[in-house]
């Protein structure tokens, strides 16, 4: 049997095939992911409450989306998980996210989970170290790629020193604190709640503080995930907002989650949350662009970012406020 294909038949068939391809493609783009991965971290207290409450699972259960929680011990680990795709949402410091973005990490900063003073330079109670200048030739515990690391580099720069003038000892944050109090290092670029713990329990001294050098706590999302699933991103941020507002209304309960998760005493959690954590403004925007541009300019000057880095363009590429802005508009319309 011979099948005759006319030009008209061919055209109609091509149109039908194209329409089918568009339909299949659209369906694939709209299909919900099977799983969402996000982190929790002791430096992001709201994430601890959110994980324990089960509100993310509650939000996505009706879609059949599984939720996987991963512990980030520092911004470096969160960025590693984001880059590898094991999580889609990760908590970092703003400065760490900026450096990660410059190094090719495919992320967008979409939300402010806190405005902290979570890092300082710390030494032992009986140490002779009084200023940053005294760190020359000393062993300093630090976690590379985190806000404490960037804080240390900027503090050294202000004192006319570089990282080459000290002896960095590379440890994760909890191990750095333990190394300090055991005398294995002379100083530590600290991070709460570990910093507050050693300050209260062993008399560790915060010998150099500068709140302006602490960059904001930002929630990041993988770019590809956000592009494919903007509604999921907005729903996740809406749940984060529920947890943030609940935390502000129930500070004692939030403190309890930090005590439980980080296994610290109540007085330690009280110092971190009561004195050094601000949850008031979750909307990432111009304030944060200015702060990260200033920090990025310094990081470029001291060699953390490449000399030819266009810092304003890098910051603009990192920060994406469209999701939280839409969430705010939706919530305002519901009031």
Predicted regions and their residues:
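Conserved C-terminal helix/tail region of periplasmic/extracytoplasmic solute-binding proteins
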Residues: 300-335
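Pocket-lining segment of extracytoplasmic ligand-binding domains
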Residues: 95, 168-169, 174-262
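Short, surface-exposed acidic
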Residues: 64-68, 163-166, 262-273, 306-313
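Secondary-structure end/capping motifs
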Residues: 227-306
């Amino acid at each position: 049997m011979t099948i005759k294909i006319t030009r008209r038949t061919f055209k109609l068939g091509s149109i039908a095939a194209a329409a089918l391809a568009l339909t299949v493609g659209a369906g694939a783009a709209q299909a919900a992911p099977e799983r969402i991965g996000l982190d929790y971290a002791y430096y992001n207290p709201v994430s601890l409450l959110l994980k324990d409450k089960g509100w993310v699972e509650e939000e996505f259960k009706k879609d059949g989306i599984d939720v996987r929680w991963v512990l980030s011990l520092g911004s470096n680990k969160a960025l590693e998980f984001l880059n590898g795709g094991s999580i889609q949402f990760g908590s970092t410091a703003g400065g760490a996210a900026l450096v990660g973005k410059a190094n090719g990490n495919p992320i967008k900063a979409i939300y402010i989970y806190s405005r902290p003073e979570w890092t300082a330079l710390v030494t032992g109670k009986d140490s002779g170290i009084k200023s940053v200048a005294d760190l020359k030739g000393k062993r300093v515990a630090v976690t590379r790629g985190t806000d404490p690391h960037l804080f240390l580099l900027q503090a050294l720069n202000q004192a006319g020193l570089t990282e080459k003038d000290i002896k960095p000892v590379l440890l994760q944050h909890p191990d750095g604190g333990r190394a300090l109090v055991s005398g294995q290092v002379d100083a530590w670029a600290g991070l709460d709640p570990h910093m507050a713990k050693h300050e209260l329990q062993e008399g560790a001294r915060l010998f150099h503080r500068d709140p302006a050098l602490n960059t904001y706590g930002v929630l990041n999302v993988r770019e590809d995930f956000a592009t494919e699933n903007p509604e999921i991103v907005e729903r996740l941020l809406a749940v984060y907002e529920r947890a943030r507002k609940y935390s502000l209304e129930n500070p004692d309960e939030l403190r309890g989650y930090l005590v439980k998760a980080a296994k610290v005493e109540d007085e330690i959690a009280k110092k971190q949350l009561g004195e050094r954590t601000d949850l008031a403004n979750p909307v990432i925007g111009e304030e944060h662009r200015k702060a990260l541009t200033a920090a990025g300019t310094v990081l470029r000057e001291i060699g953390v970012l490449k000399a030819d880095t266009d810092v304003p363009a890098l910051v603009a590429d990192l920060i994406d406020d469209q999701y939280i802005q839409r969430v705010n508009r939706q919530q305002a319309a519901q009031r």
